[in-house]
């Protein structure tokens, strides 16, 4: 799968700059936050400087703060009053900077994460089917949740630390250079060592972050599968197996998290040691080369130098946060850069008659050599029903998926009303097609909203009720606690299988599309549900061109044309009676299980 971390991909810097490109809509707030952090950082050397006046004031508290200025009120300001007042003013100035920086950067960062999350979800809506075939739902969900959270760290904490602590280091270095540039140059000698350590650690952090990202996707995937299939898990006694599967996935994630923590736990103390060695050398030189500096000057210089390790350490630690964010952003951008479904058609029709022609159609799935469909040809005139019959894996579902362009076929043509399906605008093409599949998809919403879904949203309640009645669903809907406004639960969990299928048929009836693609359910239902569903299917197929993957004999007998498929080819075609008379593939399939009696009609 493409979730694998092996691909080195683009550089961290390139990815991070692309991530920061999402800041453009918030540039005003971003600049305000930088102003705030500038204010905050400027207070650090001020605090060191105020100690100079405090120490000097110990021996002469009545000394003037600014003895050489011309304004009397400032010239007469004594240290005993000035130092406490300045500390309060510096604290207020620092508080203002902290508020501006933190608040506005949080707005920028949360907006950025929101934009990324929405962009990811919107991209999922237009990605081709093959993308979902090669990416597990767990990993896709993990990108929207966990990976975006990693980006949040890079876009909030990391930027805040880089700007605030970076500016603090700059201001403190400028202050130290101003006080004694020779001594300060000694400290600069450690910068190459720090740079090498940060670069080495960054590579490790990014590599480990990618592995964590994949491991977290595995955790989400296992949990998602187990939750969705909890009935199968319980009925087949799969609890122990799923426990072990989740335990292994979670343990793998924990181990990778610990390895990353270990890297940080080793790296940070080593960096601190380097910084404090430089500080020790600096203090030795200060004491040895004291010169004519006052005690206040020395205290201020040592204090400013002592304030440096904390922001430098925080800057070094931010590397792991940034690399986690870069790893998350890389997978996010991989999805955002994926090409959407091909939609280069220009034809739009208000309504089609429903004439479907498949001409010399061949298809194989991307990345495989096996021909799934081979030279398929047939014509369905408006209102006709074509039944596809064959063993599992014969290509029936693939053929049905090619008509609404869920996949792009390799050779041949599919024409709707004489126009190739590729020439239609994708949205317009699918507007003419109603789809009823075996696996009914319902959303955690009301019954009415599940029937009037998507383009059908906003349909009058009378039309929704009419569609439900035609699908033999209105009776059970009226018996629900809140009727059409009853919530059906996730994927219709509060409804029976037969009820879910009737809602799907009602949805197709409300759409009133000229072309119906129907994959009959193979699941065994009670006789009452079977009768209701068969009656609903008869209603939904009236007057529509229908391509049905048929499992019921009653459906097959009504077909205008039966296509018998085997290994991607049409091996027989004709009516039910004609095919039985041939005593070939269809006759054998009929003998194996297509001979059940049609349910009795409703009413």
Swiss-Prot record:
TM spans (from-to): 20-40, 79-99, 170-190, 269-289
CDD domains according to UniProt: ABC_6TM_MsbA_like (cd18552), ABCC_MsbA (cd03251)
Subcellular location(s) of the protein: Cell inner membrane
Superkingdom classification of source: Bacteria
Family: Belongs to the ABC transporter superfamily. Lipid exporter (TC 3.A.1.106) family.
Domain notes: In MsbA the ATP-binding domain (NBD) and the transmembrane domain (TMD) are fused.
Name of protein: ATP-dependent lipid A-core flippase
Originating organism: Pseudomonas aeruginosa (strain ATCC 15692 / DSM 22644 / CIP 104116 / JCM 14847 / LMG 12228 / 1C / PRS 101 / PAO1)
């Amino acid at each position: 799968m493409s979730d694998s971390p092996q691909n080195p991909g683009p550089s961290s810097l390139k990815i991070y700059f692309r991530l920061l490109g999402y800041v453009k809509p918030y540039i005003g707030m971003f600049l305000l936050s930088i102003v705030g952090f500038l204010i905050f950082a400027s207070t650090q050397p001020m605090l060191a400087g105020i100690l100079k006046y405090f120490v000097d004031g110990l021996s002469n508290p009545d000394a003037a703060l600014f003895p050489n200025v011309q304004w009397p009120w400032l010239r007469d300001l004594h240290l005993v009053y000035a130092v406490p007042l300045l500390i309060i003013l510096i604290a207020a100035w620092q508080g203002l900077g902290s508020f501006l920086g933190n608040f506005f950067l949080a707005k920028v960062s949360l907006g950025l994460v929101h934009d990324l999350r929405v962009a990811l979800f919107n991209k999922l809506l237009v990605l081709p089917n093959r993308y979902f075939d090669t990416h597990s739902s767990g990993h896709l969900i993990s990108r929207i949740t966990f990976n975006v959270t990693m980006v949040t760290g890079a876009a909030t904490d990391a930027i805040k630390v880089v700007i605030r602590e970076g500016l603090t280091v700059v201001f403190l270095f400028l202050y130290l250079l101003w006080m004694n540039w020779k001594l300060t140059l000694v400290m600069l000698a450690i910068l190459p060592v720090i740079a090498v350590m940060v670069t080495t650690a960054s590579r490790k952090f990014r590599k480990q972050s990618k592995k964590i990202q994949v491991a977290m996707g595995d955790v989400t995937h296992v949990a998602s599968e187990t939750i969705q299939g909890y009935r199968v898990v319980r009925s087949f006694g799969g609890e122990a197996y799923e426990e072990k599967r989740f335990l292994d996935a979670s343990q793998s994630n924990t181990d990778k998290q610990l390895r990353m923590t270990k890297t940080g736990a080793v790296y940070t103390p080593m960096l601190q040691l380097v910084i404090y060695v430089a500080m020790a050398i600096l203090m030795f030189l200060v004491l040895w080369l004291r010169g004519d500096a006052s005690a206040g000057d020395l205290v201020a210089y040592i204090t400013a130098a002592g304030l440096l390790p904390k922001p430098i350490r925080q800057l070094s630690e931010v590397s792991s946060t940034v690399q986690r964010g870069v790893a998350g952003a890389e997978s996010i951008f991989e999805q955002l850069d994926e090409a959407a479904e091909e939609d280069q058609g220009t034809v739009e029709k208000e309504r089609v008659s429903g004439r479907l022609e498949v001409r010399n159609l061949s298809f194989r799935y991307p990345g495989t050599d096996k021909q799934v469909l081979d030279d398929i040809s047939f014509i369905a005139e408006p209102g006709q029903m074509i039944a596809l019959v064959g063993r599992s894996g014969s290509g029936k579902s693939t053929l049905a998926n090619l008509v609404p362009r869920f996949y792009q076929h390799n050779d041949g043509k599919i024409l709707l009303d004489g126009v190739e399906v590729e020439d239609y605008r994708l949205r317009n093409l699918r507007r003419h097609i109603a789809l009823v599949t075996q696996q009914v998809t319902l959303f955690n919403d009301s019954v009415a909203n599940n029937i009037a879904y998507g383009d059908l949203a906003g349909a009058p309640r009378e039309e929704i009720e009419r569609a439900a009645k035609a699908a033999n669903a209105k009776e059970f809907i009226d018996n629900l606690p809140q009727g059409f406004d009853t919530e059906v639960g996730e994927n219709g969990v509060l409804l029976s299988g037969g009820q879910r299928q009737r809602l799907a048929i009602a949805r197709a009836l409300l759409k009133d599309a000229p072309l119906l693609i129907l994959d009959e359910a193979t699941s065994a239902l009670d006789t009452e549900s079977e009768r209701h569903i068969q009656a609903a299917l008869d209603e939904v197929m009236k007057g529509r061109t229908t391509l049905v993957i048929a499992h019921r004999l009653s459906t097959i007998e009504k077909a205008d044309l039966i296509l018998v498929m085997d290994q991607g080819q049409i091996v027989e075609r004709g009516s039910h009676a004609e095919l039985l008379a041939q005593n070939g593939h269809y006759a054998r399939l009929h003998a194996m299980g297509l001979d059940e009696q049609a349910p009795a009609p409703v009413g």
